[in-house]
Design a protein with these regions (language model features):
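Mature extracytoplasmic or organellar-lumen-exposed domains after removal of signal/transit peptides
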Residues: 1-230
Length: 230
């Protein structure tokens, strides 16, 4: 995820105005990487609301379009700096904000392409920075707290670590069932397709597949030491 988002930022910064197709490809690659780890929302991802800054969804009050359009229609010429951008609501940050800017049909009618690309660039910079922070904390400190249980660990026993991982597995499966699948299906006589995750970019089914694949891999790894599970 950290590598893919860094590449996404570099290409967006250099080619947003000239090659939107390439930006979209790298965006989708990075989004895949996020969904494959989306069930690990504890630890470094939970700290400082990092996961929500990457993936604010569902957006039940349509806050993302409101926030982004406010910047797009602004009369000012200044582009937001990263520090300024990180002060706004998480609803205006991350992959779903970027999806709106890249795929929403109304955005193509906005006249100021330079302003749009400026916003996309700062979004990818924020995404890349956040993903790197999560990766660095996992690899330099948090992984040790999971692998080595001692007085300095946040877990009191190996059993507690396993419980945290099972909780992550259960929460991920429930989110996919209730939110990714159940929410857009609605009632039998009234489906709500625009409630589907990432519907603008036609990624909804892909997210379900990737999330279930990641959950399956975690379940298999957790059950390897249990002779009662095959």
């Amino acid at each position: 995820l950290a590598k893919d988002t860094a590449k996404l930022h570099e290409v967006t910064k250099k080619k947003c105005l000239s090659s939107k197709v390439e930006v979209k490809k790298l965006y989708n690659d990075a989004f895949d990487s996020l969904i494959l780890v989306n069930h690990f929302r504890f630890g470094p991802a939970e700290a400082k609301q990092r996961y929500f800054a990457l993936a604010f969804w569902p957006d039940t009050k349509a806050r993302t379009p409101k926030i982004l359009n406010k910047f797009l229609i602004s009369n000012g010429s200044d582009i937001l700096s990263l520090d300024q951008y990180q002060q706004i609501s998480v609803a205006g940050r991350g992959f779903y904000a970027m999806e709106y800017l890249l795929y929403d049909e109304t955005i193509s009618k906005k006249p100021n392409k330079k302003r749009l690309c400026g916003l996309l660039t700062v979004i990818t910079e924020d995404i890349s920075k956040t993903a790197k922070e999560i990766f660095n904390e996992w690899t330099t400190s948090y992984s040790k707290k999971i692998l080595i249980v001692d007085q300095g660990s946040i877990y009191s026993s190996e059993k507690e670590v396993v419980q945290e991982l099972y909780k992550s597995l259960r929460t991920g499966l429930q989110f996919t069932a209730d939110t990714r699948i159940g929410r857009p299906l609605g009632r039998s006589n009234k489906p709500r397709p625009k409630r589907a995750e990432a519907y603008r970019s036609s990624r909804s089914m892909r997210h379900i597949t990737l999330a279930l694949t990641a959950s399956k891999d975690l379940a298999i790894n957790l059950s390897k030491k249990d002779p009662n599970i095959t």
